A protein has these predicted regions:
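Glycine-rich phosphate/pyrophosphate-binding loop and the adjoining helix
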Residues: 134-135, 140-192, 199, 344-347, ...
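Flexible, glycine/charged-enriched surface loops at secondary-structure junctions
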Residues: 36-41, 202-210, 234-247, 342-354, ...
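N-terminal alpha-helical transmembrane segments of multi-pass membrane transport
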Residues: 2-8, 18-23, 27-52, 61-64
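Glycine-rich phosphate/nucleotide-binding loop
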Residues: 257-356, 363-367
Length: 403
């Protein structure tokens, strides 16, 4: 059988620990036998990031801007223990954070649904995608503990040196705390465009929610920017695609989400998205069954799994023990990237391959062959728990039939 050809390379970002092992297995078992795989390779493993003073991360982000589609393996974000373990020159930043900032991207996370793993919320029969704004709010805050007798004010100084002051609170007789947060119109607009573009791409409704009734300047600004961009740039496109943009208050949104059947994109401010993406992932069953894609406002895509490097399994692997590590989210990162590359380069064969590989993966699990984490969740009667490699080989058997 002739291999499927590619025109433009994918930007390939390798990673760390068990996911790095799985990365190679996926390529060897499921990709290179079928595709003449073209990638521009960047090793984002912690050792090479350390060796290059993290320049490799910057280079990979620039390559993603150039080519438009990337696929990324999970990577270690170092802490004090990793500093010692890897003898690092310094505590390098999160590669995801660096890439997200360079692409000005929004992260979209979507659960992968399979029969036998029922969401904890029975009405959820379709996936809910969480879109999280990745800039500002409490993540770039300034905080202070305040002593009694202090007065806290919000002060801005304009270009001409003129000050505007607002009293926050007069801590006349008591200690307390204060926090300053900010956001930028440009970042909010980028977030809005990424959300609207992704909704058009996926042909799904989009919901957005803030607390603008209480936060009449801060949250209201988010609401206004979204509405303005929607009305001026996207309304006609949405109507033509038969999808809608829906705004409501965050508390109403949560109630509606719980009652809904799913099947839409839920755009959230930074903190809301941080919290709700974990809630949604857990309610659907597993972080290892979540896809994650970073989308820039100018249409650059970076696909990855929503989970970490599976350190515990990696240490077992190093001892020569078999592991039963779930590879589904990593596999779907590859299929997402290949499908998008096929779409951009007008390669229907490549898109069909990505579809077939996803079908084969879901079919494998629904026929009872799965890794240990899914076996613990699945309600199927005849389950077979397999190791990491056996699962990929089982997927390959089904893929061959679909081809």
């Amino acid at each position: 059988m002739a291999k499927i050809q590619m025109k433009t390379p994918l930007v390939e970002m390798d990673g760390d620990e068990m996911t790095r092992i799985i990365w190679k297995m996926i390529k060897d078992i499921l990709l290179t036998p079928y595709i003449d795989l073209k990638t521009e390779y960047y090793d984002l493993g912690l050792e090479y990031r350390n060796e290059t003073n993290d320049q490799v991360t910057v280079d990979s982000a620039n390559a993603t801007k150039k080519y438009g589609v990337a696929v990324k393996c999970a990577t270690i974000t170092p802490n004090a223990a990793r500093m010692t373990e890897y003898d690092l020159k310094e505590m390098w930043k999160s590669p995801n954070g660096t890439i997200r900032a360079m692409l000005d991207g929004t992260v979209f996370r979507t659960p992968i649904l399979v029969k036998g793993i029922t969401p904890y919320i029975p009405t959820w029969t379709k996936p809910i995608t969480i879109a999280r704004h990745a800039y500002g709010d409490i993540y770039k805050n300034v905080e202070m503990q305040v002593k009694a007798g202090s007065k806290a004010e919000l002060v801005t100084t304009d270009a001409n040196g003129n000050e505007t002051r607002e009293l926050i609170y007069d801590f006349a007789n008591e200690d307390g705390i204060i926090q300053g947060v900010h956001n930028r119109d440009k970042s909010i607009a980028s977030f809005a465009r990424a959300c609207f573009n992704y909704a058009l791409d996926m042909k799904k409704d989009i919901w957005f929610a803030t607390k603008d009734t209480i936060s009449k300047k801060y949250d209201h600004r988010f609401k206004d920017i979204f509405q303005e961009i929607y009305d001026n740039e996207y309304k006609e496109k949405f109507e033509a695609a038969g999808i809608e943009y829906f705004y409501t208050l965050i508390d109403d949104a949560v109630a509606r989400v719980i009652r809904s059947e799913g099947g839409y994109i839920w755009a959230c401010k930074n903190y809301d998205g941080d919290v709700m993406s974990d809630m949604v992932a857990t309610a659907y069953g597993s972080l290892a069954m979540m896809t994650s894609v970073l989308v820039s406002p100018d249409g650059v895509y970076e696909y990855e799994a929503a989970h970490g490097t599976v350190q515990r399994h990696y240490y077992k692997h190093l001892k020569g023990e078999k592991t039963s590590t779930n590879s589904v989210a990593t596999l779907f990162a590859w299929t997402g990237a290949l499908r998008k590359r096929g779409e951009l380069d007008e390669l229907p064969e490549l898109m069909k391959f990505a579809d077939n590989l996803e079908k084969a993966t879901i079919q494998t699990i629904e026929e009872g062959v799965m890794t240990g984490d899914l076996a613990a969740l699945s309600t199927l009667e005849n389950k077979q728990k397999v190791d990491t490699e056996e699962f990929l080989l089982a997927v390959n058997e089904r893929l061959q039939k679909l081809m």
